Amino acid sequence: MLELRHRGGCPGPGGAGAPPPREGEAAGGDHETESTSDKETDIDDRYGDLDARGDSDVPEVPPSSDRTPEILKKALSGLSSRWKNWWIRGILTLTMISLFFLIIYMGSFMLMLLVLGIQVKCFHEIITIGYRVYHSYDLPWFRTLSWYFLLCVNYFFYGETVADYFATFVQREEQLQFLIRYHRFISFALYLAGFCMFVLSLVKKHYRLQFYMFAWTHVTLLITVTQSHLVIQNLFEGMIWFLVPISSVICNDITAYLFGFFFGRTPLIKLSPKKTWEGFIGGFFSTVIFGFIAAYVLSKYQYFVCPVEYRSDVNSFVTECEPSELFQLQNYSLPPFLQAVLSRETVSLYPFQIHSIALSTFASLIGPFGGFFASGFKRAFKIKDFANTIPGHGGIMDRFDCQYLMATFVHVYITSFIRGPNPSKVLQQLLVLQPEQQLNIYRTLKIHLTEKGILQPTLKV
């Protein structure tokens, strides 16, 4: 464990910044015998490594280079650093929003590819931090196994998605039928192979560090892959369940920044000193108003409200349906005090607008805690941003730290309060059954509908 003892850049056991010698250690000798090394390992196993003793032992990650385009640097060279950063963030934000609108126009399949691309980049940024922190140890197979586990977990989650939403397409392909039928076993076998490779890669002098990074990889997978899978599940419920939550988080991020930039005086949380109560409160009200208006606009169009379905006859995704009651105007009675102010007793709203208030409230009150969590993580490793992918913003993970928390909430919200039985999904499951099973279900359903009076009894001749 001697390598871990020197990780913070200490020159040696007696150098500046070195921890005091513990019981059983030589206090100043350069030569260590085999028995002394074994004794250190035993002490480390009982009391823990020096890693857990404080942030001072955590090595700093090398700072990222500035990727701001030269044309922007020249145009903003006369401004103070505060206003220069404001303009860079603003220009890049408008650029990203424009590209996002373009991808929305291109359809749900491109949105799914975007989510997968963001997932891979976020995983890369978090894993790279771990690799930079421990790069001097040359851990065997660390990066290879990390990407292998990413592949395995994606195969597990998205194989389930293919089985659920592409059943009619799978029926036409014999090879895919095998993969879908034994999907979970194949997923487990792939993961087990990676697990065995990890065990075989263990090296005595790096045991503890290798298990640290094994846990690091799995927590990263939990944060990125699981949440991106939930985002795509939300998208299949209808593009509106994807757009309103994501745009609410973006709106909160922008408006909280603007309110904090111009009016911020009172610090909000120590983890993120630049966050202020003024920005937090201003972002909350702005986000609720934005979400309510966005829900009204998007609820008018089938393209946004219909569940995303794969149609085998046209070999593409379609968003055509009769909108549910959630997206049909209804009259709501106003409270008495509003009736007096507005001189009307009722107001026409889409029911989804009521749900949008819950989504916007979560995005503005709880969503920022995803950002605070990320700030704590970055402080622990003494870094400013996860990466320097986007000038003025940092890495992709810096932009989506709140989105992952939002995705989980939306999925839980849909399954708890919105989703009912899906006839299309039930039909797809029926189509993959054996003919005898389909006939039994048909007879049972016919008897049930006849007993309820929906079907007329069949007269026997």
Curated annotation (Swiss-Prot):
Pathway info: Phospholipid metabolism; CDP-diacylglycerol biosynthesis; CDP-diacylglycerol from sn-glycerol 3-phosphate: step 3/3
PANTHER family reported for this sequence: PHOSPHATIDATE CYTIDYLYLTRANSFERASE, PHOSPHATIDATE CYTIDYLYLTRANSFERASE 1
Organism of this sequence: Mus musculus (Mouse)
InterPro entries with a match to the protein in the record: PC_trans (IPR000374), PC_Trfase_euk (IPR016720)
Cofactor(s) needed: Mg(2+)
Phosphoserine sites (modified residues): 35, 37
One record GO biological process: positive regulation of fat cell differentiation
Topological relation to the membrane, as annotated: Multi-pass membrane protein
Function: Catalyzes the conversion of phosphatidic acid (PA) to CDP-diacylglycerol (CDP-DAG), an essential intermediate in the synthesis of phosphatidylglycerol, cardiolipin and phosphatidylinositol. Exhibits almost no acyl chain preference for PA, showing no discrimination for the sn-1/sn-2 acyl chain composition of PAs. Plays an important role in regulating the growth of lipid droplets which are storage organelles at the center of lipid and energy homeostasis. Positively regulates the differentiation and development of adipocytes.
Keyword Endoplasmic reticulum appears in the UniProt entry: yes
GO cellular component: endoplasmic reticulum; endoplasmic reticulum membrane; membrane
Subunit relationships: Homodimer. Interacts with FOS; this interaction may enhance catalytic activity.
Record has Transcription as a keyword: no
Main localisation: endoplasmic reticulum
Reactions catalysed, as given in the entry: a 1,2-diacyl-sn-glycero-3-phosphate + CTP + H(+) = a CDP-1,2-diacyl-sn-glycerol + diphosphate; 1-octadecanoyl-2-(5Z,8Z,11Z,14Z-eicosatetraenoyl)-sn-glycero-3-phosphate + CTP + H(+) = 1-octadecanoyl-2-(5Z,8Z,11Z,14Z-eicosatetraenoyl)-sn-glycero-3-cytidine-5'-diphosphate + diphosphate; 1-octadecanoyl-2-(9Z,12Z-octadecadienoyl)-sn-glycero-3-phosphate + CTP + H(+) = 1-octadecanoyl-2-(9Z,12Z-octadecadienoyl)-sn-glycero-3-cytidine-5'-diphosphate + diphosphate; 1-hexadecanoyl-2-(5Z,8Z,11Z,14Z-eicosatetraenoyl)-sn-glycero-3-phosphate + CTP + H(+) = 1-hexadecanoyl-2-(5Z,8Z,11Z,14Z-eicosatetraenoyl)-sn-glycero-3-cytidine-5'-diphosphate + diphosphate
Official protein name in the record: Phosphatidate cytidylyltransferase 1
Compartment annotation: Endoplasmic reticulum membrane
Transmembrane segments: 96-116, 149-169, 183-203, 230-250, 279-299, 357-377
Source species, domain of life: Eukaryota
Keywords attached to this entry: Endoplasmic reticulum, Lipid biosynthesis, Lipid metabolism, Magnesium, Membrane, Methylation, Nucleotidyltransferase, Phospholipid biosynthesis, Phospholipid metabolism, Phosphoprotein, Transferase, Transmembrane, Transmembrane helix
Positions with biased composition (Basic and acidic residues): 22-56
GO molecular function, one term: phosphatidate cytidylyltransferase activity
EC id: 2.7.7.41
Tissue: Expressed in adult brain, eye, smooth muscle and testis. Highly expressed in the inner segment of the photoreceptor layer of adult retina.
Residues found modified as Omega-N-methylarginine: 7
Annotated stretches, region: Disordered: 1-68
Homology family: Belongs to the CDS family.
